[in-house]
Amino acid sequence: MVKEMVQLSDDELLRYARQVLLDGWDMDAQLRLKTARVVIIGAGGLGCPASETLVRAGVGYVHLIDDDEIEASNLQRQTLFLPDDISKPKALTAVAILARINPLIKTYGTVARLDEDNAYELLDMAAGKPDLLLDCTDNFATRDIINRISVRYQIPLLSASAIAMQGQLALFEPQLDTGCYHCVFGSVVLDEAADERTCANSGVLASTTAVMGNLQANAALQYLGLTKNPLTNKLLIWDGSQMQQRLMGYRKDPQCPVCSSPIINSL
């Protein structure tokens, strides 16, 4: 159910007309987007296309968190930035563009690195839990921290990754106790050597981040608008070099130190 007394304005009806015409997508779905609050961690190769699509689709509140500055090497794939933006904060620069793309929604940017100590404040938990976290970061250690925050505060987490010509995507719902990021990638997170493979040293094709960022946005729109998880206990694996995509099932790890820990769950 959407929140009471929420309606679409004439401008919103015109802007989202093609979306509302979709089979299986009605006015209630669009209204759910309007009342949704999404926090995106990482305003880079994944965060740029994901945030732009969500903003264009009508997600009512989009908050970007990133502590990095724009570099020349980012321009190849980070679609919200221009050469004149080099050395500017990613989060604030991206939000300025997003606000121009859709002035009918609320966009916020914070220059900070999200961690377990500042999560309550940065996620504005005093105002209530966000409806969805989007992990658009680029290393296992940071993703594991975001996962711990997701489990701690019981916030759904949509995690994407992209490197070279490959990508992965999963949507974890800690409130359903069906497993978390650590259940799937725990062994990799604990392997420091694996964390060294990043876009900076392994490369990434521009289209890879565009595809994965928009697949991430697609899953977010279905989750927020249609209240369904298209990836329940499934990891989507995309291989751009072979133009192949497959789904791999996973289960909750009963020994997971994150989502199976009574200490974490009770915080």
Could you tell me what each predicted segment is?
Residues 1-267:
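Adenine nucleotide-associated cytosolic modules
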